């Protein structure tokens, strides 16, 4: 008797009996192919597409904060005055982690109270030699000469302001107060603010670096952008690096820029002084409390009321941190974009600042810096906004901590890797292989 409804006998197909184990062998081959593809996938540059996973909280002891060591321009853990003090790793020059990255604790920033010819030749090679710490008393170059001796309780770390009096507002005092501020110039004209994070590296926003056939230079140690000073240096830019995920527009309107960050590598390193000093980068896992008072510094809009630029000398303005959810809600009402679309994402941070026309910094990448126990951290860089005349809309800064791994990868000289496919695509590909294996 034939099977009901012409059903095939198990183990046989319309063309005859199946070969035992053929389907299983084909499935195994497909799975091996999938494993090979996963092994060959290029590594994703950290900090460009995904948010780094937060490390677990540790109440006791608190993990050390990660800081720039100005003498070398590399990441290292070290001590600082006050409650942020940590233990230095054993032995001089010890790097943290496999690539020199040290674990960072949760930094909760509290509320705060309120012309000479520029040298264009590279400095002496001995001056440019990398420095290393010697115990806790001083620094030496690679030749063994003592360059500077410091007290053990006053080690020279990043984020040190060299002007303690906040009432002084003259240009020279402003340079000492914000020694990491540099002017990024294209073909001799100021276009954006930059932030010194190492002797040969400047951080800025990507939308200032999108021009072609431009000669970039960086002016450091000067409060003016239209003249030099005895403390200033103009250094040509050797290399421009823009985050490969940068998008000038995230949506169909003016709202938002994505991954608006870039790096400038200088042709030679700057010599540190009280007018030239790097700022600290916050750790991967840190918190800036809502309503905390921070500072925006820079030169403002490059062209205001027909006058270029808005300010010739360095300016500063205090702003307060705005809750991200409130900021996102405001922009949904302001732009009429669907509430299903998230406008303010984890790579952004909002600030409350009224009367921005007086100091309009919306398109020139001015930094947002916050102080904790006397140490200054680069929290954000001005990315986008609706315009300084619409002061009711908060300015949106790129959140620097999100891009800390990307910055370190570029500074450590790792090759630029292609972005890896998302987990969703990998899962879909795996399901497709399983379906093919059952045929």
From Swiss-Prot:
Its EC number is 3.4.25.-. Residues 48-415 are extracellular. Residues 437-439 are cytoplasmic. Residues 1-22, 48-130 are annotated as: Disordered. The chain crosses the membrane at residues 416-436. It is a single-pass type I membrane protein. Residues 51-61 have a biased composition (Basic residues). Gene3D superfamilies: Trypsin-like serine proteases. GO terms for cellular component: endoplasmic reticulum; membrane. Pfam families: Trypsin (PF00089). It comes from the Eukaryota. PANTHER family: THREONINE PROTEASE PRSS50-RELATED, TRANSMEMBRANE PROTEASE SERINE. May be involved in proteolysis through its threonine endopeptidase activity. This is Probable threonine protease PRSS50. The lineage of its organism: Eukaryota, Metazoa, Chordata, Craniata, Vertebrata.
């Amino acid at each position: 008797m034939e099977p009901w409804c012409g059903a095939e006998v198990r183990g046989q197909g319309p063309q005859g009996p199946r070969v035992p184990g053929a389907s299983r062998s084909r499935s195994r081959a497909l799975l091996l192919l999938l494993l090979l593809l996963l092994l060959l996938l290029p590594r994703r540059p950290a900090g460009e597409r995904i948010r780094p996973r937060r490390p677990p909280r540790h109440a006791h002891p608190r993990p050390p904060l990660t800081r720039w060591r100005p003498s070398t321009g590399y990441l290292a853990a070290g001590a600082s005055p006050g409650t942020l003090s940590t233990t230095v790793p054993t032995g001089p020059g010890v790097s943290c982690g496999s690539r020199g990255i040290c674990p960072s604790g949760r930094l909760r920033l509290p509320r705060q109270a309120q012309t000479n010819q520029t040298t264009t030749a590279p400095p002496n090679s001995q001056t440019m030699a990398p420095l290393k710490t010697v115990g806790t008393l001083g620094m030496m170059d690679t030749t063994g000469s003592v360059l500077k001796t410091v007290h053990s309780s006053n080690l020279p770390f990043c984020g040190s302001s060299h002007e303690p009096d906040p009432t002084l507002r003259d240009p020279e005092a402003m340079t000492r107060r914000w020694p990491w501020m540099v002017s990024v110039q294209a073909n001799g004209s100021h276009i954006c603010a930059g932030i010194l994070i190492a002797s040969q590296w400047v951080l800025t926003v990507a939308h200032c670096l999108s021009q072609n056939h431009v000669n970039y230079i960086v002016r450091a140690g000067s409060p003016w952008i239209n003249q030099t000073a005895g403390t200033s240096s103009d250094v040509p830019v050797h290399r421009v690096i823009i985050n490969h995920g940068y998008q000038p527009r995230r949506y169909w309107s003016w709202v938002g820029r994505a991954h608006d960050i870039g790096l400038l590598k200088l042709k030679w390193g700057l010599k540190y002084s009280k007018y030239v000093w790097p700022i600290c980068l916050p750790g991967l896992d840190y918190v800036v409390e809502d309503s905390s008072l921070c500072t925006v510094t820079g030169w403002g809009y490059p062209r205001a009321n027909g006058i270029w630029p808005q300010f010739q000398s360095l300016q500063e303005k205090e702003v307060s941190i705005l809750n991200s959810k409130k900021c996102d809600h405001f922009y949904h009402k302001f732009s009429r974009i669907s509430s299903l679309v998230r406008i303010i994402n984890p790579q952004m941070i909002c600030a409350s600042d009224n009367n921005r026309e007086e100091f309009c910094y919306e398109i020139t990448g001015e930094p947002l810096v916050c102080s904790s126990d006397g140490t200054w951290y680069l929290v954000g860089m001005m990315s986008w906004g609706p315009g300084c005349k619409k002061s009711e809309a908060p300015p949106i800064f790129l959140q620097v901590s999100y891009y800390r791994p990307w910055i370190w990868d570029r500074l450590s000289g790792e090759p630029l890797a292609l972005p890896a496919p998302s987990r969703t695509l990998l899962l879909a590909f795996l399901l497709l292989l399983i379906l093919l294996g059952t045929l």
